[in-house]
Amino acid sequence: MAKTLYEKLFDAHVVYEAENETPLLYIDRHLVHEVTSPQAFDGLRAHGRPVRQPGKTFATMDHNVSTQTKDINACGEMARIQMQELIKNCKEFGVELYDLNHPYQGIVHVMGPEQGVTLPGMTIVCGDSHTATHGAFGALAFGIGTSEVEHVLATQTLKQGRAKTMKIEVQGKAAPGITAKDIVLAIIGKTGSAGGTGHVVEFCGEAIRDLSMEGRMTLCNMAIEMGAKAGLVAPDETTFNYVKGRLHAPKGKDFDDAVAYWKTLQTDEGATFDTVVTLQAEEMSPQVTWGTNPGQVISVNDNIPDPASFADPVERASAEKALAYMGLKPGIPLTEVAIDKVFIGSCTNSRIEDLRAAAEIAKGRKVAPGVQALVVPGSGPVKAQAEAEGLDKIFIEAGFEWRLPGCSMCLAMNNDRLNPGERCASTSNRNFEGRQGRGGRTHLVSPAMAAAAAVTGHFADIRNIK
């Protein structure tokens, strides 16, 4: 029987499946951070259980860390306790930890792929909703809760029901300046923020194949923002070339054997999906969210929509509430909306290609008066690479702040946050009320669009910036 990629990955990992019971899946990789793991380790300790497979478990610090100092005390008592607990737990249970002073420390979903921890064909879990990022490699990756974190630590397995399947095909080639972030925001604009609920999404089509691995990670990172369980891109030569030579990747003949298997990780011809969505890449333009969920998104050259234009009463009410929170009026051009802060970073857009795209816009320009702009590399290696290329100097000269790696202003769990009423052009993945700080107003954009907003002081079409 013809199978989808998701079905192949799922079936290959079923350990046990009794009739009328949820299947038990084997987990190949477990990524751990300081926020969702303390109670899980406490649970192990209380029952006298070890971590079953320490060699398949990797930990880092990212959510709570300061991006201005390596001092563990910098972000307050709760953050300090969580980080100290992670150090203690990893030492006690034999788990590899990339702590604040480790050169590989960074956002968990940047670190995993970078170190070759993430490989095609794997099941990967983490106590973090954006674990879907790793699906870019043709891995089945999804976020789990703290009780599930404990279960995986103890057993290296997890009970998981089968999801429905969705195919999102982006046909044709994207125009210059249109990034993976624009593509995924356009997709969510079409499906809505709940359009993928109950599904695992496979992204395909020429525009997806054309993306680098970093672009594919951006894409899969935001699968969760359309309500999907996970996002997938089938592995190909782009994938294999990215993985080759990385720290934890197979070497020599083992790598060749792995590639031979990875090449089978494609949806079979004739396999059926529960839902199919098709978009045309050439119709896409730079995207900016205007509301309080990622599905409330328009082209940078559009006007703020009028809630009255929505036929669905629920959508209309949601739009009215969003505009009130965002302090926006219907009908005004998006390019006239001024911003206070810019955040370039997060597990969506903090990799080297993202920083290069932002630096290209920043070069030779200055951050607009009254705007604070942060650039936060996703990991130690990304920061080192950017500095080797001189990107830090470009940003600093333009008036951006060049920070240490961490989750930073994506979420209000550290010192980087918005004040009430402040408006931010952000490369992160969520624009919910209060996500970047109580009363903060978040607009999601690509790195180049964020840099353009920083230097102009408002939203601007990067295609017009010469």
From Swiss-Prot:
Listed GO biological process terms: L-leucine biosynthetic process
Enzyme Commission number, as recorded: 4.2.1.33
Pathway assignment: Amino-acid biosynthesis; L-leucine biosynthesis; L-leucine from 3-methyl-2-oxobutanoate: step 2/4
Reaction(s) the record says it catalyses: (2R,3S)-3-isopropylmalate = (2S)-2-isopropylmalate
Source taxon at top rank: Bacteria
EC class: lyase
Keyword terms: 4Fe-4S, Amino-acid biosynthesis, Branched-chain amino acid biosynthesis, Iron, Iron-sulfur, Leucine biosynthesis, Lyase, Metal-binding
Binding site for [4Fe-4S] cluster: C347, C407, C410
MF-aspect GO terms: 3-isopropylmalate dehydratase activity; 4 iron, 4 sulfur cluster binding; metal ion binding
Bound cofactor: record note: Binds 1 [4Fe-4S] cluster per subunit.
Cofactor(s) required, per the database record: [4Fe-4S] cluster
Record note on quaternary structure: Heterodimer of LeuC and LeuD.
Cited NCBIfam families: leuC, PRK05478.1, PRK12466.1
Protein family (similarity comment): Belongs to the aconitase/IPM isomerase family. LeuC type 1 subfamily.
Function field: Catalyzes the isomerization between 2-isopropylmalate and 3-isopropylmalate, via the formation of 2-isopropylmaleate.
Protein name (database record): 3-isopropylmalate dehydratase large subunit
Organism: Escherichia coli O127:H6 (strain E2348/69 / EPEC)
Gene: leuC
